[in-house]
């Protein structure tokens, strides 16, 4: 019997590694698995099963279940009792109401994933110029994830003749405010050799107004396409980079990705249409490990 009590990081690391090893070696995990929260837990990339980052533990448990006929229970709540050959077990928590809250939240997040995927598909049908009208939303600092991103360290790195604006996962409003306070503007832009685009190219972390006060033709986007809760880069972000008002259309823009474009789009969603590189005078450099 293997029991995954809940989905905090400090409780799942060893189990994730064990599940990955069992899939690699084609061996059974256990005769029975208890895991109410498997839908929350993301699996790391698995070399032999071609599992994508972001595949949930529930998917992998189903694979093991089919291969090795393990019993997987995801309905455990207080009052459940069972007798095993080596012990008797009685579940004393969680209450059924809490278990149902977890199920509801998983279902809601599943719907959000479908909505996000559909949004990327819909955006592919829209022109680059149309997408530039999107205005990034203000972060909700009452949400843990958005507070964490808002606290992200962004910096200007200068070394010899090289300068890079490294934006971490920060929000554009904070960076734009700071740069304007330092005297940068549309008529006096910050000039850098590279911009590391914020938050893997998420649509809410890059804005036209920020790009309008930066002069740069080379943009680094660090992403493998996203995970089960988001897809990156957003086509909207690409649109901002290519079409913000102050961009010099005569200068070619270079987009650098640390993974192959095919992998990024397979994990996430397509973000470019045929012919757009020529139309908007930009070039994709993928699977880049050094600049």
Enumerate the language-model features and the residues they cover.
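Active-site metal-binding motif and surrounding structural segment of the metallo-beta-lactamase
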Residues: 1-33, 185-204, 213-220
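Active-site environment of divalent metal-dependent phosphoester hydrolases
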Residues: 7-13, 40-43, 78-80, 98, ...
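Alpha-helical scaffold elements adjacent to nucleotide-binding pockets in ATP/GTP-utilizing enzyme cores
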Residues: 13-18, 53-56, 60, 237-240
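Flexible, acidic/histidine-containing loops and adjacent segments that form or flank the divalent-metal
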Residues: 22-163, 251-291
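Conserved phosphate-coordination/catalytic loops
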Residues: 142-149, 201, 231-235
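Long, well-ordered mid-to-C-terminal structural blocks that present hydrophobic/aromatic surfaces
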Residues: 155-208
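C-terminal regulatory/interaction regions
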Residues: 173, 180-182, 189, 209-213, ...
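Short secondary-structure boundary segments
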Residues: 223
């Amino acid at each position: 019997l293997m029991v995954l009590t809940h989905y905090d990081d400090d409780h799942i690391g060893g189990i994730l590694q064990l599940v990955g090893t069992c899939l690699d070696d084609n061996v059974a995990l256990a005769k029975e698995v208890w895991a109410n929260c498997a839908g929350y837990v993301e699996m790391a990339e698995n070399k032999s099963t071609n599992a994508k980052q972001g595949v949930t533990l529930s998917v992998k448990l189903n694979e093991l279940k089919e291969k090795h006929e393990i019993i997987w229970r995801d309905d455990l709540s207080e009052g459940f009792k069972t007798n095993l050959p080596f012990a008797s077990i009685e579940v004393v928590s969680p209450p059924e109401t809490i278990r149902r809250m977890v199920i509801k939240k998983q279902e809601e997040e599943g719907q959000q994933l479908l909505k996000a995927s559909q949004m990327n598909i819909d955006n592919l049908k829209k022109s680059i110029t149309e997408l530039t009208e999107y205005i990034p939303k203000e972060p909700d600092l009452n949400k843990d994830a958005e507070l964490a991103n808002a606290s992200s360290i962004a910096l200007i790195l200068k070394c010899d003749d090289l300068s890079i604006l490294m934006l971490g996962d920060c929000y554009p409003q904070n960076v734009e405010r700071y740069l304007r306070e330092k005297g940068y503007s549309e008529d006096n832009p910050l000039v850098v050799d590279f911009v590391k685009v914020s938050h893997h190219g998420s649509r809410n972390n890059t804005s036209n107004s920020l790009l309008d006060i930066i002069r740069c033709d080379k943009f680094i986007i660090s992403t493998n396409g996203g995970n089960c809760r988001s897809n990156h880069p957003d086509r909207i972000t690409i649109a901002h980079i290519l079409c913000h008002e102050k961009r010099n259309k005569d200068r070619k823009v270079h987009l650098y990705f640390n993974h192959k474009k095919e992998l990024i789009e397979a994990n996430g969603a397509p973000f470019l249409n045929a012919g757009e590189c020529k139309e908007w005078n930009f070039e994709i450099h993928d699977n880049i490990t050094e600049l």
